[in-house]
């Protein structure tokens, strides 16, 4: 917890602010991108969430253990009874709203300058993202488009676009001003109103100038409107949104990309093109950073992965001080 009572002058109230620092923050002089996230109670600690946590810290620590760069994450608690009021820029006669503009202004003009002053950040828009779910997804979309000079990445999970038609008027009027990466996510079990809203927004974003390489809209079969669903999708969204940073591997990390064959993978990965005599360890991680296969001094020219669940994985081969990393899809 960074501050239990951080003052929000735009709203004249105080709020708990959380901060996640990368594992190497204290031992390096590096500067880091920043991801701002809403509903801070649900991001890091199950004891502060009544609905389950995203496990953002565990997930990023796991990615870091694979040699993947991770950002600073700033979590802003929601305001309880004020949550919808603060996350909705327009008034809904049934649910409230109307303070989203002030909340977004707080993020941009009060909180971000404080974070940039007190921590080793990369403050440029290219290195700043925003992410949230449900109403937090809605305000992420709003803030990212309104402040394209501040944010270049938006993670929009299960957005509640249905709550106000004003979101469509806003989006069509704002226009693309800067290159962006916008990642929308929806569970297949969230209902037609949510799902169709996401696809309509995809079309609306394309209509104001965003290219297909700037947009991801994913409908995950069986996904529900829950923290556990968003938790399981967080790593994949982060890796795409921060793709340039994730893959900007300095020589001090001595990490090199490898191509994996076949990919997607059925039962076995072909290792025959690698010099196994020089290999110290072989390890496979899931997207939450959990090691699911580890072998020291492997000798077989194929790796059995048939017991892995379908999904995305990372294979890391270590030779002395070097690491070779490749991503694969298990069918």
Could you say what each language-model-derived stretch is?
Residues 248-249, 260:
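Disulfide-bonded cysteine-rich modules in secreted/extracellular proteins
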């Amino acid at each position: 917890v960074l501050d239990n009572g951080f003052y929000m002058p735009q709203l004249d109230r105080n709020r708990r602010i959380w901060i996640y620092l990368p594992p190497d923050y204290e031992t390096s002089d590096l500067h880091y991108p920043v991801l701002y996230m809403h509903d801070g109670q649900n991001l890091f600690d199950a004891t502060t969430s009544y609905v389950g946590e995203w496990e953002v810290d565990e997930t990023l620590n796991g990615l870091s253990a694979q040699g993947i760069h991770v950002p600073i994450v700033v979590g802003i608690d929601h305001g309880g009874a004020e949550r919808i009021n603060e996350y909705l820029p327009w008034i809904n006669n049934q649910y409230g709203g109307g303070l989203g503009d002030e909340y977004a202004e707080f993020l941009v003009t009060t909180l971000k300058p404080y974070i940039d002053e007190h921590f080793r950040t990369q403050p440029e828009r290219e290195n700043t993202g925003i992410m949230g779910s449900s109403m937090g997804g809605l305000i992420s979309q709003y803030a990212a488009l309104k402040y394209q000079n501040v944010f270049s990445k938006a993670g929009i999970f299960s957005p509640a676009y249905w709550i106000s038609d004003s979101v469509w008027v806003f989006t069509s009027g704002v226009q693309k001003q800067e290159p962006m990466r916008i990642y929308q996510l929806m569970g297949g079990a969230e209902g037609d109103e949510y799902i169709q809203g996401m696809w309509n927004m995809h079309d609306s974003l394309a209509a104001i100038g965003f290219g297909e390489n700037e947009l991801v809209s994913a409908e995950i079969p069986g996904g529900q409107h829950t923290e556990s669903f968003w938790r399981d999708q967080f790593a994949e969204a982060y890796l795409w949104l921060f793709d340039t940073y994730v893959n900007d591997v300095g020589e001090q990390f001595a990490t090199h990309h490898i191509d994996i064959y076949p990919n997607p993978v059925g039962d076995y990965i072909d290792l025959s093109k690698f010099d196994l005599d020089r290999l110290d360890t072989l390890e496979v991680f899931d997207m939450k950073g959990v090691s699911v296969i580890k072998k020291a001094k492997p000798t077989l020219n194929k790796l059995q992965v048939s017991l892995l669940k379908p999904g995305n994985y990372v294979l890391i081969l270590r030779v002395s001080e070097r690491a070779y990393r490749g991503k694969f899809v298990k069918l």
